[in-house]
């Protein structure tokens, strides 16, 4: 009999065996790290462009919310593009902003926890700054004028209705205190606890811990129109329904055109213990319940009678059937498709090991998810109580099926289910088959980086050669990765990190992200503030067609004069773009100057036996930099190879001590996607050291003479410093720093003297 999670032989390389987590996990992790298959895992690409916070400010592509302050904890964002409003849930406050201009007349509603609750929270040993406050975790549009909101309330969750009054130019928030109610099973106690909720048809579905200690994990339905306002929740008597769950996301998705068959899908991770060992592992799950589930009649009263769950697998297939797993689900994003019943499911996963650190993005189809729920059930059997495939009789109607008169006129609600259906689903909530990525492996991975992926937003972009799903991935270090995965002609995928953006002034974990495709903006919330980031900044790629084409950014194209936003409906004929291959030679006219004839020649003088540095930095971190030199009297260029005297760095070429034979023309070239161009052309002239030393007495004499003009004196001082024996770069910089400081002090003293003279003139 097969164990739950174990595949048939045909799928053995794609699925994982339950019970692999044992005391040998440490050695297994190390083995997996060194046996990772070649492919998109180990050959990870660098971000093509890396921009810091100052770079984003300079390019005007980031706008920080000026009304925020340190420790505000912006982890709840509600974007309503239809009504043009942006609500932020923070510590003790709710903000109402205009998404067109987040700093234009922002409105702030104060909603702190009561003093008694704060004192009790502190007495319970919680942190008064980061825990004992009202952190807003729930913001859902209830109708056109009201928002349902919940906060942690200093470990005493509280919910209420907020009303948005006024018009767009003069709106404000009003808290209806008479609607305040307990937020238990609607909102977490702990502000740092993962949590998921969705409000649809006036019902609130929430996955959270329902107790102070955070042990009782439950998925609950509450609110609703009268008289259907009773709680429906998961069964806590059996820990194999949800065991120490951490909820990530919840979404209403229709399975068929029959509204009675509509379901709520929610994603979470939980602790899983196999019966053969006491070790606990973390597994990611997708679960679903019917929206018309009202609980059982005699059993499972006020509890879900259609609850089913299946494992989400995100792994890299390895040799001998040993896969590298990313088991901790961090975030989920549903990318809509033409068929609203079949969105693409994007998930961010991380590893559970502290030795092997990694993150991955896997994509799933609703077809595969539904196939798992329509497949065999799992069953605990044997002395070790392992989950195995259930091969017995399945009662009618099939457990997990939504009640509908279309299927059976005798079953109108879940209270009409036979007792054997209720008993079966109570003991068999887990499906036997796991859900695997549509590509069989992650579409994007990060291994042993200083950060981990925590958030994901996906935007579908129309380009010249097709449509692309551009991913914006938030990290726990405050950066956002802009990534596109391209499928080539041979069906192999290529991951491209277009940009790495440091969106916060002070790096901190990204807590939430929302995208506005209408405004082409990304709203990013963190512990200390919120920023608005543009989805594209085409002008930073360069001033030529080739540079714009090499960027491979679906948002950008060459319009004949500059790199600008690509608009599919544009009537411009000179749109140049190649996302799939990034080959400017077939799209641009400025690709023939490989020898750099059009690059401006710079002249540089160096002194024999001194060092010289030729700076050359490519805008692209993915480009291969190569150096060439054309010596006098030689008719062809020679590539420079590093040795003990010549060093090639990421910033340029360093010649540690110059020789007479180093004179010549130096070329810095950049090669990217089989396209080569010249970035720098320097003509290096070597000055004879003996001649420089012969002029040193004259230089000293002229430098001591105050009658010598300042420009001439500074130029001679430069020559004097360059001619010094084996002067290091630090010594050179220190000398220049002292000289500039002395000149500033001299100028400042001269200015003070002039002021005193002018004052004396006034008094006399």
UniProtKB/Swiss-Prot annotation:
Keywords: Developmental protein, Differentiation, Disulfide bond, Glycoprotein, Immunoglobulin domain, Neurogenesis, Secreted, Signal. Pfam families: Sema. The keyword Metal-binding does not apply. One of its GO terms (cellular component) is extracellular space. Residues 743-764 are annotated as: Disordered. GO terms for biological process: axon guidance; axonal fasciculation; blood vessel endothelial cell migration; cardioblast differentiation; cartilage development; cell proliferation in hindbrain; embryonic heart tube development; embryonic skeletal joint morphogenesis. The keyword Protein transport does not apply. Coiled coil: none annotated. It comes from the Eukaryota. CDD domains: Ig_Sema3, Sema_3D. Residues 1-41 form the signal peptide. Glycans are attached at residues 143, 490, 610. GO terms for molecular function: chemorepellent activity; neuropilin binding; semaphorin receptor binding. Residues 661-740 form the Ig-like C2-type domain. It is found in: Secreted. PROSITE patterns: SEMA (PS51004). May play a role in the guidance of several axon pathways. Belongs to the semaphorin family. This is Semaphorin-3D. It comes from Danio rerio.
